[in-house]
UniProtKB/Swiss-Prot annotation:
Keywords: Coiled coil, Toxin-antitoxin system. InterPro entries: ParD, ParD_sf, Ribbon_hlx_hlx. It holds the Pfam family ParD_antitoxin. GO terms for molecular function: toxin sequestering activity. Antitoxin component of a type II toxin-antitoxin (TA) system. Upon expression in E.coli neutralizes the effect of cognate toxin ParE1. Residues 33-60 form a coiled coil. Gene3D superfamilies: Antitoxin ParD1-like (6.10.10.120). Belongs to the ParD antitoxin family. Residues 54-83 are annotated as: Disordered. NCBIfam families: antidote_CC2985. This is Antitoxin ParD1. GO terms for biological process: detoxification; regulation of DNA-templated transcription.
Amino acid sequence: MGKNTSFVLDEHYSAFIDGEIAAGRYRSASEVIRSALRLLEDRETQLRALREALEAGERSGSSTPFDFDGFLGRKRADASRGR
């Protein structure tokens, strides 16, 4: 069951909502707000995942140098041997 909540919007957001309804993208202000909240929730979820990945990377310690030329040499050698 939904919860009735009221809030005050400034002219900018009020006009934006009215424009979305007039354009036929939404049927009501409630639909616009629900859509905006879904987007905000998705963004927060993505940011949380990014923060967790960054923290995991920091905990994994210092990186080691990568020898790209050596890597390519090994791959080419493997390819020539049919691996």
